[in-house]
Amino acid sequence: AIAQLVENEFYLTLDADVICLKPLDESKLIIDGKALLQYEQRAQHPKWWKSSARILKMSPDVGPKDLGMTVTPALMSRTLSQKLMQELSPNKAGENWVDALCSLHDPANPRNWWIGRFLKLKWTEYSLYYLCAMKLGLLEQYHVIAGTSQTPALLLIHDSHPYESWNIAGSFDAANPGLFCVVGSKTRLPPKEVWQKVAPYIQGSAEQPPL
């Protein structure tokens, strides 16, 4: 929904457990007018891709085999997001794309007692976004793939897993292609503990301890 409000063509999505590894500016995130997009194996979350393809009434077998985009941190195009909203909008008067998605999760709605509706439940905004871009043939117009020889930067690296053996200095090294890493909230680690480990590598961090 934020795509209806932002003025820039691209916007960055973040979660609270994402850590920025180096100073950033637009030139590191947007290359020749196209935003970085990073692949991951669809096998990590196969239901996302199947459910999203069903919602968009398309085959999930598009693009590089077995690959889809990562989730946060992610760069998204306002134009592509708006086109996704149009694709999701029902033809029925008085309903919009929000209704179309949220109604799938209402157990009291008799329509959801049909197996076909149940099989659409596991969507995410990222799988919908990527598949819609592929359906419309617009992905390459707005995105460049991260982690290639031409564009070595990575939006996300996984050096922080497992946390106990994390080489923090290596993650923050200027030569590391990673722009962000994640210390997942599901680890249940106290934020203060994580902060104490990363603070020495973040300029001015001593003045900004976490709550």
Descriptions of predicted regions:
Residues K92, N96-L211:
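A glycosyltransferase accessory/donor-loop signature
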